[in-house]
């Protein structure tokens, strides 16, 4: 997808960054603030430092829709090592145990993957950002404290084995995963290894999609530094993410002033736009009236 030129005075929009490894999501936000010359900037969905791939950045008023993106489905390409467990459930942790996976058959791996597909309850990773008594779980884990997190419902729509390589007592498998928000791929690696009685951890992770935004729209930080550009304007992003409802002039004014409309009969959130395709607000039908989810263009603008 072509990107929209950005520079001083550019409008609000979305930038899809291909996050490099060895950077935190916060580091990427800091770099983008310098590139785009604004502090009003945020991201949707944290990626671990070792992970690469899609990180959606909202600029200026586009930060208003980031919360809606965090709750959407995501896709990943990952490599899982069977036969070793680590303290962080990924390659950055200390080795905890090694159990030979030499005897594990591909059919057993496929069966264990199938058991972890669909609606499941997953215990989040102990080194997650979930808060426990006001502190992040990963902070407690790094201090050597035992972290017990409750299992949560998640949905794994696709968990597919793409390749398998045998090494000395370990098996490396490449997988692709489509999942709901709140799914921890590290926890999938942990649980897959546990199901096979050999342990497992994540050795690489690349996010390939967040909602409607994927790697085909992504730019590297170096590319953005050379040519700052939006992946999509705020209007384009809203119309890509949600169904469209066309408004009359009077309806546009009402929505811009925060007044409800007659329902549209559209399930979920939809983008209410004027005749020029400018999104006035994201709305939801509630009973006999609409409810504003996000007002994109208030009447005061």
UniProtKB/Swiss-Prot annotation:
Regions annotated as coiled coil: none
Cysteines engaged in disulfide bonds, as pairs: none
GO biological process, one term: tRNA pseudouridine synthesis
EC number: 5.4.99.25
GO molecular function: RNA binding; tRNA pseudouridine(55) synthase activity
Pfam families, per database record: TruB_C, TruB_C_2, TruB_N
Gene3D superfamilies from the UniProt entry: Pseudouridine synthase (3.30.2350.10), PUA domain (2.30.130.10)
Transmembrane segments: none
InterPro entries according to UniProt: PsdUridine_synth_cat_dom_sf, PsdUridine_synth_N, PUA-like_sf, PUA_sf, tRNA_psdUridine_synth_fam2_C, tRNA_psdUridine_synth_TruB, TruB_C
Record-linked CDD domains: PseudoU_synth_EcTruB
Catalytic function, reaction form: uridine(55) in tRNA = pseudouridine(55) in tRNA
Positions of the catalytic residues: 48 (nucleophile)
Keywords: Isomerase, tRNA processing
Physiological role: Responsible for synthesis of pseudouridine from uracil-55 in the psi GC loop of transfer RNAs.
Family designation: Belongs to the pseudouridine synthase TruB family. Type 1 subfamily.
PANTHER family, per the entry: PSEUDOURIDYLATE SYNTHASE TRUB1, TRNA-PSEUDOURIDINE SYNTHASE
This protein's name: tRNA pseudouridine synthase B
Organism: Mycobacterium ulcerans (strain Agy99)
Gene: truB
């Amino acid at each position: 997808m072509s990107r929209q030129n950005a520079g001083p005075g550019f409008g609000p929009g979305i930038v899809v960054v291909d996050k490099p490894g060895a950077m935190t999501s916060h580091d990427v936000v800091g770099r983008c603030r310098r590139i785009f010359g604004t502090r009003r900037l945020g991201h949707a969905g944290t990626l671990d430092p070792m992970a690469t791939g899609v990180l959606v950045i909202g600029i200026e008023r586009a930060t208003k829709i980031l919360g809606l993106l965090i709750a959407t489905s995501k896709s990943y390409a990952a490599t899982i090592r069977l036969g070793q467990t680590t303290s962080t459930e990924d390659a950055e942790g200390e080795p905890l145990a090694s159990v030979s996976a030499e005897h594990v058959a591909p059919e057993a791996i496929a069966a264990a993957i199938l058991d972890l597909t669909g609606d499941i309850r997953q215990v989040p990773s102990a080194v997650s950002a979930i808060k426990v008594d006001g502190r992040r779980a990963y902070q407690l884990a790094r201090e050597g404290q035992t972290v017990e997190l409750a299992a949560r419902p998640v949905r794994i729509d696709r968990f597919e084995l793409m390749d398998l390589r045998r090494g000395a007592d370990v098996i490396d498998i490449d997988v692709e995963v489509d999942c709901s928000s709140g799914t921890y791929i590290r926890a999938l690696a942990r649980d897959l290894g546990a199901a096979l009685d050999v342990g497992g951890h994540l050795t690489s992770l690349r996010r390939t999609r967040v909602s409607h935004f994927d790697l085909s729209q992504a730019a590297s930080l170096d590319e953005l530094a050379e040519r700052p550009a939006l992946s999509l304007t705020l209007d384009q992003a809203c119309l890509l993410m949600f169904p469209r409802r066309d408004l009359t002039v009077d309806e546009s004014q009402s929505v811009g002033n925060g007044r409800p409309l007659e329902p549209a009969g559209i399930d979920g959130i939809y983008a209410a736009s004027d005749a020029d395709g400018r999104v006035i607000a994201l709305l939801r039908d509630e009973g006999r009236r609409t409810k504003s989810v996000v007002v994109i263009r208030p009447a005061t603008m």
